[in-house]
């Protein structure tokens, strides 16, 4: 099944099935960069579908994966920060207070990484 087929499933309301299929594809990928790019793509797809809760989860996952992408902590922080900021914004829209606080905490830590470097 192609990614466009999976997106079509999401558009017709079969988001649970689409999510399962995307996670299976995600598990097959070896490269951290591929995983980060897939997460960003999935997040933007959910954003386009106005499913902001799912978009937030995928942006948060993108940020998490970005933290381990290279051996440079500061480079990883630079990549992860905008993803956590997007996740926090969408969690805010969805009134997910606990997740907003978690993202805010991670963002504060990432900002400290910039100051330290």
For the regions a language model picked out, list residue spans one by one.
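Residues that mark the junctions of alpha-helical repeat units in TPR/alpha-solenoid scaffolds
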Residues: 35, 55, 60, 72-73, ...
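"A position-specific structural signal for the A-helix of alpha-solenoid helical repeats
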Residues: 4, 41, 61, 66, ...
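TPR-repeat structural position
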Residues: 15-16, 32, 52, 77, ...
């Amino acid at each position: 099944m192609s990614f466009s087929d999976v997106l079509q499933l999401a558009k017709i309301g079969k988001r649970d099935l689409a999510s399962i299929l995307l996670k299976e594809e995600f598990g097959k990928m070896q490269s951290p960069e591929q995983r980060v790019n897939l997460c960003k793509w999935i997040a933007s797809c959910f954003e386009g579908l106005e499913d902001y809760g799912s978009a937030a989860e995928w942006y948060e996952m993108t940020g998490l994966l970005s933290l381990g992408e290279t051996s440079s902590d500061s480079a990883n922080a630079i990549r992860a920060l905008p993803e956590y900021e997007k996740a926090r914004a969408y969690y805010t829209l969805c009134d997910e207070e606990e997740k907003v606080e978690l993202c805010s905490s991670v963002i504060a830590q990432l900002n400290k990484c910039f100051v330290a470097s």
